[in-house]
Amino acid sequence: MPRKWISALFLLQISYCFKSGHCGKVLVWPMDFSHWMNIKIILDELVQRGHEVTVLKPSAYFFLDPKKSSDLKFEIFSTSISKDELQNHFIKLLDVWTYELPRDTCLSYSPILQNLVYEFSYFYLSICKDAVSNKQLMTKLQESKFDVLFADPVASCGDLIAELLHIPFLYSLSFSPGHKLEKSIGKFILPPSYVPVILSGLAGKMTFIDRVKNMICMLYFDFWFERLRHKEWDTFYSEILGRPTTVDETMSKVEIWLIRSYWDLKFPHPTLPNVDYIGGLHCKPAKPLPKDMEEFVQSSGEHGVVVFSLGSMVSNMTEEKANAIAWALAQIPQKVLWKFDGKTPATLGPNTRVYKWLPQNDLLGHPKTKAFVTHGGANGLYEAIYHGIPMIGIPLFGDQPDNIAHMVAKGAAVSLNIRTMSKLDFLSALEEVIDNPFYKKNVMLLSTIHHDQPMKPLDRAVFWIEFIMRHKGAKHLRPLGHNLPWYQYHSLDVIGFLLTCFAVIAALTVKCLLFMYRFFVKKEKKMKNE
């Protein structure tokens, strides 16, 4: 890069420092996989504003690539588990969740999912032990004098490192199973009467039966997640900190929660002052397409194009399913751009082109795009909302069924089950979403809502990180409920006291009435006898 451009970039970063009043040092404890894609957008913006960002990278991480992030600093440390072990487990989790897990109720799939997540938790406990027991690494972090730690709470340990370094920390989170982390650690208020539990597949206005299912799911996830986290993790945290503690107690010291969702996707519920919703922070205006792709899109004429992508984490599907999908795509008049990394289907039509990679945001922002076939990942959904494109949802795993259920409830999508859908089902869904203006109208309303914010989601995320650095925390925003034991938080001691008082008063009243009754009965008998 020419020297004058380096100087200009340096001056730009310095100007951001003066504007914010402080150029800080940010330590990051990330999670791998698609979670890294979301957090990296925030980190890049922090660097652009002149902050120094250091990412702790376990050697077992395979998705997080330092070579693709030249502006960030990385501290890579060795782990006792290998990259292949973590990758193989993740692939196994995807395959089982996508093709084997029952989807009737949370109770039907939870025993299988429970075993997968237990193993996943073990991997991250091992990585955490490798990090905090690395004396050379911890000494270097201590000497670096970081201002704040930014972490993903699904990969526990960032809070422990922040505690050891005596620095404030904040979380970036999409969801946790059953909203357990949000409720037990963040004290989020999520009444099961009208807030669907994540992974329940419910959305919008719930019937009585739905609310019964929702309550059962909530109770199950609360019980399951308690068992998942409260043995080895608690013991380990207590050993490292040198005092009896729990992982929940340490995590509850978080200053700010940045939730990667927003009210265009979510349904309303009560929130807290130390929680901000930053869904769609990666969305941006479309850029021009590559020349050959633009020519293909323009060749669609008035019919337009359909964009088909099942995300970055799924590379292929069964040959039978791919052929069924390709056949349905060949029946529509639109041109189709399909992100697919498998064997070319025999039924692929002349209107469909297959790509190993697509500029998804740029395609969704193209004026000729009519519909988006998606697995329901939050990133893709927000790009579709941002550009106002109706969807055909084929959810695979994680929160995707819930995300698509929300879009269906808001009238912006049609949902299909990848295991049971036929080629005719897929064709019918395509024709419904493309030809019925109902879906376009509803998604455009969501798009308008998303764009009508006083501050962009990315700017809000950066603001809160800088806020924590400026003020050394945000204790004034944390609910006092964090300092209460569970029985006080739920007012069980007050309820018990009031019930006791009521019981005592009731008992005294009954005794007084009995005494008066006996007194007057005896008096009446005495008068009769006289």
Curated annotation (Swiss-Prot):
EC numbers on record: 2.4.1.17
Catalysed reactions listed for this entry: glucuronate acceptor + UDP-alpha-D-glucuronate = acceptor beta-D-glucuronoside + UDP + H(+)
Gene this chain is encoded by: Ugt2b
Membrane topology: Single-pass membrane protein
Physiological role: UDPGT is of major importance in the conjugation and subsequent elimination of potentially toxic xenobiotics and endogenous compounds. 2B2 acts on various endogenous steroids, especially etiocholanolone and androsterone.
Assigned protein family: Belongs to the UDP-glycosyltransferase family.
Carbohydrate attachment residues: 316
UniProt induction comment: Constitutively expressed.
Keywords per UniProt: Endoplasmic reticulum, Glycoprotein, Glycosyltransferase, Membrane, Microsome, Signal, Transferase, Transmembrane, Transmembrane helix
Signal peptide start-end: 1-23
Positions of transmembrane segments: 494-510
Entry PTM: Autoacylation in vitro.
Disulfide bonds: none
A UniProt-annotated Pfam family: UDPGT
Coiled-coil residues: none
Chief location of this protein within or outside the cell: membrane
Taxonomic source organism: Rattus norvegicus (Rat)
Lineage: superkingdom: Eukaryota
GO molecular function: glucuronosyltransferase activity
Keyword Glycoprotein (UniProt): yes
GO CC terms in record: endoplasmic reticulum membrane
SUPFAM superfamilies membership: UDP-Glycosyltransferase/glycogen phosphorylase
Protein name stated in the entry: UDP-glucuronosyltransferase 2B2
Compartmental location: Microsome membrane; Endoplasmic reticulum membrane
